[in-house]
């Protein structure tokens, strides 16, 4: 009885190993590119702590870091001490000043609140797109059905972007301890308490009178949530720091980057400070890179609070961290100052319209260089068809067309391997005791018939970076939030609520696999290979992906099936012609 040796099933084993390797690589790369943080909103945890304990922790763990980065022309020890005293004074912020709202700006799109400390305390978004909240966890759904976890489906007419007790936008701190404490004890006044924003910008003037020092903040707020800032101090040479605030807390997604991004004003290099990673060592290591920044942005998955400047020297950014190592950004000024800011969704063209460099705030991770043009292509397709779901279908078609030459070669190569299987088996029987000769004859056989045992894997390998880039685009692009496709798919950025797409994806993957030629000699290898569609299906259900991504994968499988059927017909036609030609040749010889 014939028993295949190592050379017998070497090529089929290679294909199985590559397929399994790609599957493992898929999960490994996914974990690498999209590491999941513990599902804990560190800002909310920060809020829940006692204020005094929090401020003592900030003073102990982060103040020195900020001080070593500010005012390099000063004596470092003096600078460190002054800013340390300044930050520690925040523990004495009167609770009433933090809670008192002195001005409101209201529009159809948003509502903005300014408190008695002269800070932008809260921004509410009113668009239905941002108010909607989809369930994003299979386990949460199951728990809700079983009554193990209460549903959080509170109805709201606006979305708050920030937590209550975090570092807020436009918060000022002074190096001079006495000025700093007095500033925290003295409320601001506003020239107007309520403004209805229509189509034109509005200006709010905030004034703080400290006796020997008068501070004026001129905020010009635009309808798109961009704003211009002009700071005037009645005394010159006063060193102070203004924060763009800690990141918004409206989105609790744990796969997206959350923290602070700065862009170097000279070379455009981005420096990132992720929540939980802003240790003193990391802050010190990156201190020099952020001292001249074109922008500093606190970001979560969909939203940002940022400062930017077109000044030649940019913004002098200094960074601290709270007790949970979440970044706390500041910009250093001395005397009067002017800059601009923005609070709101990270919509690409909105940011581009404000300042072109702000598009770097839309962060797609390590593959941004590939994901950003992919998003622009997807957006172009959306402009053509008016639906993000159909845009994904068109994008998938374009990807398949671009990869078709390689896909065709790979599929033809796999068909040739299947056709050569009897000859390969004959060689394996003939040279079973001489592996070296077997290898030589097999290579000659491949060369003679133009077959490549690895050719079928190349198209799949090339699709992996496309897959991850599309994942980042669909997961991070706020433009797709709450965007419906058809029927039950009401949000392409959330999971399929009924898991229909993951099942269809698995079925289409199985059909594609059945149509693809195979030349397995080991039944175990074949079984393992056939399990892959179900492994992927289960993975897509237990660890759910956005519906848009599963749609891409499913449509990709459908196009693959169509391509495979057409290629199979082409190959069958070629075979029929070869058989007919061979038959004619024999007939002619007999004649």
Curated annotation (Swiss-Prot):
GO terms for molecular function: membrane insertase activity. It is a multi-pass membrane protein. CDD domains: 5TM_YidC_Alb3, YidC_peri. GO terms for biological process: protein insertion into membrane; protein transport. It comes from the Bacteria. Keywords: Cell inner membrane, Cell membrane, Chaperone, Membrane, Protein transport, Transmembrane, Transmembrane helix, Transport. It is found in: Cell inner membrane. Gene3D superfamilies: 2.70.98.90. It holds the Pfam family YidC_periplas. The chain crosses the membrane at residues 16-36, 388-408, 450-470, 485-505, 531-551. One of its GO terms (cellular component) is plasma membrane. Interacts with the Sec translocase complex via SecD. Specifically interacts with transmembrane segments of nascent integral membrane proteins during membrane integration. Belongs to the OXA1/ALB3/YidC family. Type 1 subfamily. Required for the insertion and/or proper folding and/or complex formation of integral membrane proteins into the membrane. Involved in integration of membrane proteins that insert both dependently and independently of the Sec translocase complex, as well as at least some lipoproteins. Aids folding of multispanning membrane proteins. This is Membrane protein insertase YidC. It comes from Helicobacter hepaticus (strain ATCC 51449 / 3B1). The lineage of its organism: Bacteria, Pseudomonadati, Campylobacterota, Epsilonproteobacteria, Campylobacterales. The gene is yidC.
